[in-house]
Curated annotation (Swiss-Prot):
Its EC number is 1.14.-.-. PROSITE patterns: RHODANESE_3. Belongs to the TrhO family. It comes from Legionella pneumophila (strain Corby). This is tRNA uridine(34) hydroxylase. The gene is trhO.
Length: 254
């Protein structure tokens, strides 16, 4: 019985007091019994956590009680056990580390496409379909005809753009990632560089898998997730794939 709710969320918003938010949030997680990881930075908040329905609703209400987080959107998936072993709240320079200054997805991100819009859009042969995730994620599964940037971590993505895409600023470029946060940054970064037509899959691969019937899906393989499930299939059920020997669970989190 899948009675554990796993929620992922993020929001790009200036948080001048982000350091002072750590202890209250961590205390509340312990109090409620929520497990997972939340990352705070000056640019916003990002996280994934899990619990039963009652615990999750209490924690949602707590987070949204801060007016800056009143509109937080939590993307839910479900499992029979909690994929996190403890509660963590981390302070970072970025909520997802790309290492490029002055990229602000809060106002300059690419055009959102719903799963249904995305499904049609990426079948256009003139669209450049780009996977923004890491090499080991791509190897587990990706969209049909997607380009692999062959990067070990997200910090390498800007260099990939400079080496391979800088002469394609007038092309339609569709980007995707697991839950959407990396695409917020990649599309904003590319718009800053002058790319004119950049699009992103709203709420990421997980939203597509939930929305598009498997019989029609353009997704091939499994989808890596950053918790103890390791990966999920097209039904969003956990699987235990054979990962490459150089796989490092914390690589994207550093």
């Amino acid at each position: 019985m899948k009675d554990i709710i796993i929620a992922s969320f993020y929001k790009f918003i200036p948080l001048n007091d982000f350091e002072s938010l750590r202890e209250p949030i961590l205390t509340k997680m312990h109090e409620i019994g929520i497990k997972g990881t939340i990352i705070l930075a000056h640019e916003g908040v990002n996280g994934g956590f899990a619990g039963n329905r009652e615990q999750m609703n209490v924690f949602y209400d707590y987070l949204r009680s801060d007016s800056r987080f009143a509109d937080l959107h939590f993307k839910e998936t479900y499992d029979s056990k909690n994929p996190f072993d403890k509660a963590k709240v981390k302070l970072r320079k970025e909520i997802v580390t790309m290492g490029v200054q002055k990229v602000d997805p809060s106002y300059n991100a690419g055009t959102y496409l719903s799963p249904e819009e995305w499904h049609q859009f990426i079948q256009d042969p003139n669209v450049i379909l780009l996977d923004t995730r890491n090499d080991y994620e791509y190897e587990l599964g990706t969209f049909k005809n997607a380009i692999n940037p062959d990067i070990e971590n997200f910090r390498e993505f800007p260099d990939y753009v400079q080496r391979n895409l800088i002469d394609k600023k007038d092309k339609k470029i569709a980007m995707f990632c697991t839950g959407g946060i990396r695409c917020e940054k990649t599309t904003a970064y590319m718009k800053e560089l002058g790319f004119q037509h950049v699009y992103q899959l709203h709420d990421g691969i997980l939203n597509y898998l939930e929305s598009i019937p498997e019989s029609e899906s353009l997704w091939e393989g499994k989808c890596f997730v950053f918790d103890d499930r390791v990966a999920v299939d097209q039904k969003l059920d956990r699987v235990y794939p054979q990962l490459p020997q150089d796989y490092k669970y914390e690589r994207e989190q550093k």
